[in-house]
Amino acid sequence: MDRPVTTLFMLMSVDGKISPGATDNLDVDKDFTDIDGLKEGLHQYYEIEQTTDLWSLNTGRVQAKLGVNEKSMPDKTPVSFVLIDNSHLNEHGIKYFCQLSKQFVLITTNSNHPAFKVNADNVKQWS
């Protein structure tokens, strides 16, 4: 019997979020729960996400969009975060991730980034 060879691909953006496209018109966490055909299986994504690595790679742009520059300080989690950001996070957003993260790594080419004003034990710096 001839059977087709198949491969399943899951496309996601480099920042780790399911991406609805290049614009900010749709937000996966807010809008996909209202779309028939997507909302029924969205819980599977979140269940799998909970079993993945304890390191998260994301961008300052996404985190600023999610409101970390204004949110109240979170409880510490066992997850370590790597953020790529040149201009989207303010000092509060950096402190938010220092509080949230087991370890926090910021990748930036901006020598005036607000992160350089923050001192925290879990921040990794290389020169």
Where are these regions (language model features)?
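N-terminal nucleotide/polyanion-binding subdomain common to many enzyme families
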Residues: 1-100
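Histidine/lysine/aspartate-rich catalytic loop segments that bind and position anionic ligands
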Residues: 101-127
